[in-house]
Amino acid sequence: MTNNSTCIQPSVISTTALPVTYIFLFIIGLFGNSLAQWVFLTKIGKKTSTHIYLANLVTANLLVCTAMPFMGIYFLRGFYWKYQSVQCRLVNFLGTLSMHVSMFVSLLILSWIAISRYATLMKKESKQEATSCYERMFYGHVLKRFRQPNFARTMCIYIWGVVLVIIIPVTLYYSVVEATEEGQSQCYNRQMELGARPSQIAGLIGTTFIGFSFLVVVTSYYSLVSHLRRVRTCTSITEKDLTYRSVKRHLLIIQVLLVVCFLPYSIFKPIFYVLHQREGDCQQLNYLIEAKNILTCLASARSSTDPIIFLLLDKTFKKTLYGLLTKS
């Protein structure tokens, strides 16, 4: 096997561009998400299910923002650190844990928001257009729950609990066992970047989960468009069309987020696991590792840009924030 010190050689992209990007994302993400959380918790009186989902999404964003300085320092100095050093262990564990917990919590909440927005559309239609017993039960009881604040709070608690129970053991195993199996000396090493088979299997399961979340959003969006076309063929434009357009815009925003930020990462992950197994091709290995790290950074960038998305997703948040800015 090619020696780690000669095979794994980070380029200027890893040692300069990624640290600068992570620090920049940390600054704007911390400010924007802190402001958003302050608005959600203190300035919005009657909270809807959407507000609860978004507040938990902000919490996940703040979690990944706290990991960004660790990730930036890792790429800047990791090649020079000894693996057994305190800073290496700390950066590795906290960075990996925060990044993955935030990613999966965000995906689940985005999926729940998509279902909640679709439930908003079907609220009035369930009584007017549902004819079968199945339709009345599904639209009147199942989807209705996604719009209830208490249900939203309960689901968010379950989301955080399940994700933490799954991610923490995997991260501990990766940080304590896998990254030291081959006796690497540097913190930035082959085993740290690739992981052993258990971590790769967990990564593939996570990729499948990302695909499922994307499928939920796409299905909600497709159902909305189909319903809107059916309504417009038999009715004139009414006030409800404004609701349709609003929900359609919300689902489209979530869909674009998943496509731009998460889909490249999830598509590349299986390819990465297959191609890196070729022994001796150090140049290709370095390219693969840097591509993986760039796409991971892209996935985490969503957390820093979410406050802008909130302005598009929630009118109450937009009015409250504009009111605060006007007063100041």
UniProtKB/Swiss-Prot annotation:
Glycans are attached at residues 3-4. SUPFAM superfamilies: Family A G protein-coupled receptor-like (SSF81321). One of its GO terms (cellular component) is plasma membrane. Residues 33-55, 116-156, 219-251 are cytoplasmic. Disulfide bonds: none annotated. The keyword Transmembrane applies. Residues 1-11, 77-92, 178-197, 273-328 are extracellular. Its main location: membrane. The keyword Cell membrane applies. The chain crosses the membrane at residues 12-32, 56-76, 93-115, 157-177, 198-218, 252-272. One of its GO terms (biological process) is response to food. Keywords: Cell membrane, G-protein coupled receptor, Glycoprotein, Membrane, Receptor, Transducer, Transmembrane, Transmembrane helix. Belongs to the G-protein coupled receptor 1 family. This is Probable G-protein coupled receptor 82. It comes from Mus musculus.
